[in-house]
């Protein structure tokens, strides 16, 4: 079940309060705030939880997965530095909420999810709301080479280390005056917690990357199918 115009009116003030909460928590990118505020988050959660849809909290979506806390979505999106028409790969479609936010920012979004049931559900909601997201069922640690290179890659699950295929699929800088190339935002660490990390591609060589670390978060684990994840 997707949102309706009457739903939008019902939840409008809750969305506005959520945006103010994110601003108070340190999200200052107005484009990101506008995008989060434009997405009908209640459409991505179970109907029984819709009264909590605009609280700044993660909510269960089944299969031991969650729809990310809005602050986390806004934080990662701000670090990614999304520009209109950027080609963005999302690893971990989940509910589809992050993909919708990226679409609101004008990105071309490609999203991978390893749980087929979640992907079908997210696909239905995204289509119902009119978001143009290309999706794929598969192992996100391998990226999606067919549509690479990407201006940005966002990983919505915690990883013990950065998957090399994702680095290789970042766009190279196009010239000396154009600054760094593609950006990867990924939480790195064990199951007990991760450090939000941003990697920028700075050249065409195997070591031409710059890495920055930011705040601590706690995500569900990113599973590599070669390691026996189920």
From Swiss-Prot:
InterPro entries: PCMT, SAM-dependent_MTases_sf. It holds the Pfam family PCMT. Its EC number is 2.1.1.77. The active site is at residue 68. The keyword Transit peptide does not apply. SUPFAM superfamilies: S-adenosyl-L-methionine-dependent methyltransferases. Its main location: cytoplasm. Keywords: Cytoplasm, Methyltransferase, S-adenosyl-L-methionine, Transferase. It catalyses: [protein]-L-isoaspartate + S-adenosyl-L-methionine = [protein]-L-isoaspartate alpha-methyl ester + S-adenosyl-L-homocysteine. It comes from the Bacteria. CDD domains: AdoMet_MTases (cd02440). It is found in: Cytoplasm. One of its GO terms (molecular function) is protein-L-isoaspartate (D-aspartate) O-methyltransferase activity. One of its GO terms (cellular component) is cytoplasm. One of its GO terms (biological process) is methylation. Catalyzes the methyl esterification of L-isoaspartyl residues in peptides and proteins that result from spontaneous decomposition of normal L-aspartyl and L-asparaginyl residues. It plays a role in the repair and/or degradation of damaged proteins. Belongs to the methyltransferase superfamily. L-isoaspartyl/D-aspartyl protein methyltransferase family. NCBIfam families: pimt, PRK00312.1. This is Protein-L-isoaspartate O-methyltransferase. It comes from Salinibacter ruber (strain DSM 13855 / M31). The gene is pcm.
């Amino acid at each position: 079940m997707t949102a309706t115009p009457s739903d939008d009116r019902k939840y409008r003030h809750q969305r506005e309060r959520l945006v103010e909460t994110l601003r108070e928590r340190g999200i200052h990118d107005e484009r990101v705030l506008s995008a989060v505020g434009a997405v009908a988050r209640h459409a991505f959660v179970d109907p029984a939880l819709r009264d909590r849809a605009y609280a700044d909290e993660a909510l269960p979506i089944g299969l031991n997965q969650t729809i990310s806390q809005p602050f986390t979505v806004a934080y990662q999106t701000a670090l990614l530095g999304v520009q209109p028409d950027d080609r963005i790969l999302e690893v971990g479609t989940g509910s589809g909420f992050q993909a919708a936010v990226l679409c609101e920012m004008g990105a071309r979004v490609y999203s991978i999810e390893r749980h087929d049931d979640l992907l079908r559900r997210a696909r239905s909601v995204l289509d119902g709301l009119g978001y143009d997201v290309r999706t794929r069922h598969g192992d996100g640690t391998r990226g999606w080479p067919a549509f690479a290179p990407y201006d940005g890659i966002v990983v919505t699950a915690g990883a013990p280390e950065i998957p090399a295929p994702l680095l290789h699929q970042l766009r190279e800088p196009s010239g000396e005056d154009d600054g760094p190339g593609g950006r990867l935002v990924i939480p790195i660490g064990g199951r007990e917690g991760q450090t939000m990390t941003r990697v920028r591609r700075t050249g065409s060589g195997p070591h031409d990357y710059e890495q920055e670390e930011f705040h601590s978060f706690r995500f569900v684990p990113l599973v590599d199918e070669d390691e026996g994840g189920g």
